[in-house]
Amino acid sequence: MPMFPEKILQSTPHKPGVYLMLDAKARVIYVGKAKDLVKRLTSYTRHSSSEHNKTTVMLKKVEQVKTIITTTEKEALILEASLIKKHKPRYNIILRDDKNYPYIAVTVGEEWPRVMMVRRKRRDNSRYFGPYSSATAMWATLKLIASLFPLRNCRGEKLRPRTRPCLNRQIGKCLAPCTGNVSRKIYMENVDKILLLLQGKSRDLLAELKRQMLQASERLNFEQAGQFRDQIRALKTTLEKQLVAAGHGKNQDVFGYVRSGTTVAVNILFVRDGLVSGSRSFFIEDYFGLDSQVLSQTISQYYDRETPPPKEILLPFSPENFELLSEYLADFTTHILQIKIPQRGDSTILVEMANTNARQLFAEKEKKERSWQSLGKSIKEKLQLSRTPETIECLDISNISGQHAIGSLVCFSGGEANKSRFRHYKIRTIEGPDDYGMMREVMERRFKRGIKEGNLPNLFVVDGGKGQLGMAMAVARELGITNELDWIGIAKERHEEGEKLYKPGRKNPILLPAHSPVLLYLMRIRDESHRYGITFHRKLRNRATLSSELDEIEGIGDNRKKLLLKKIGSLKKIKEASLQKLQEVEGIGPLLAKKIYTSLQRDKNKS
């Protein structure tokens, strides 16, 4: 019996394009591309409900199909990648590695650039390198940069002149442009060398340092020549510690691909100047499509203008639409791109290394699952729960005398933080300092939606003792969910007594040893809810402070406040922003930028 309605094809042309499948709630659940939309969609009408696979499950949920016609198949591929990133459809391949990897940013848009670690890219003039899967490797790189090319690390885009250099200058960790100790020409030469290093062009950097050393020697400037010599030695020592991948000096990305059941692990080795400089891994669970399709979609999602491909990509097998994919990736780079499926030689060793790393992902996943099974069993037994708590949620209320009140809900699944289910709730109905009332409001909103969507947790952790737990149980009784999940209160008592765990219907608290894995896990969840709440609460306070200060400036309304925050960030960053940076914000012209800059600088000097 066909499930895909043929009426969808009536208005569909025989042209290339993209199709979006929507469910009953008008949510995009799948995005696909086609050289011929009619032929591609017709293939779904032939699919029978008697087949038991992911396609069957998906097609049963399809209520509507939208199509977007493109001129070429390449345009369809570009649009498909863009729409997948935008909608994150349930049945497409979404690259997730559950980690917020750091980047190294070089603020080349500033007059005197800085080098720093950041957690996310901003749409500014900075150059970003990464992400670094190993924080240790990233900090080692920053340490090397600071020792070889010591740029300023003071805060603020604008350099503030000083009469005396800072401590970093005195210990040789800063060139001290603030005191006029270095010319901008020499400073920017150091920036260029840092960019070469971060781009993986270590051979080019060594050649440049040797050239400058010889020039300094010819000028009889032996002190400067000695400095270049020391930089060369330090750089060579660092490079010798890296794994030599091959006898060449190529830049390559090497893909490893391993499937186990309905899960795929992908590992990407980064080879720069013939050295393995790092890697990144992804899990793709319950995927839709053949291995060649999965690999093709993984590659098209991974690369973009912010993450351009290197000169060479090595793959374990041929992806779907090989030529089209090559053409698509070529748009993201200025050099000639080669995509190879090696059959012999050193390149096959690299691909096997990437495959081995992908297999290791499964081993680590199995180890985590075994660890959680043991911990989950202990939690159930120690707390006398009705079920193993695969999902645990915890709520924290943050406010200062009732101001900027929010509820922060965190969720842990299978022993790990499930950040896709973290939520902030702005308090709507309670005024003044009423923690119980705020708690009731947030819980009602969370559980009413949870009942409707069928996603209640197995265990709910209340941050507090008997009083807070009693309030939670009152809400549970009103909603009829007292037995749908387990409930625990965790209260920090006097220091010598430690943490106490409270259960509904039990008079005395459960006392666990301070080193108990069960207690430590519950404390970790509770502390994460505090951190999540405090971070957002601080952001709200900053916005309120910004609003009050900007309200005094003529020409600034709510829309421009939002634009300033979106473009620049916090109040602190807006206060530190240069005139040029303020003018880059949409709707802020030169006159208004000067007015904002003058006003905020005056307020800052007063404080």
UniProtKB/Swiss-Prot annotation:
What InterPro entries does the entry give?
GIY-YIG_endonuc, GIY-YIG_endonuc_sf, GIY-YIG_UvrC_Cho, RuvA_2-like, UVR_dom, UVR_dom_sf, UvrABC_protein_C, UvrC
Q: Which UniProt keywords apply?
A: Cytoplasm, DNA damage, DNA excision, DNA repair, Excision nuclease, SOS response
This one is known as: UvrABC system protein C
Output the Gene Ontology cellular-component terms.
cytoplasm; excinuclease repair complex
Give the top-rank taxon of the lineage listed in the UniProt record for this protein.
Bacteria
The record ties this protein, via Pfam families, to:
GIY-YIG, HHH_5, UVR, UvrC_RNaseH, UvrC_RNaseH_dom
Subunit organization: Interacts with UvrB in an incision complex.
Name the job this protein performs. The UvrABC repair system catalyzes the recognition and processing of DNA lesions. UvrC both incises the 5' and 3' sides of the lesion. The N-terminal half is responsible for the 3' incision and the C-terminal half is responsible for the 5' incision.
Q: Which CDD domains match?
A: GIY-YIG_UvrC_Cho (cd10434)
Where is it located?
Cytoplasm
Domain UVR, by residue range, is 203-238
**Taxonomic source organism:** Desulfotalea psychrophila (strain LSv54 / DSM 12343)
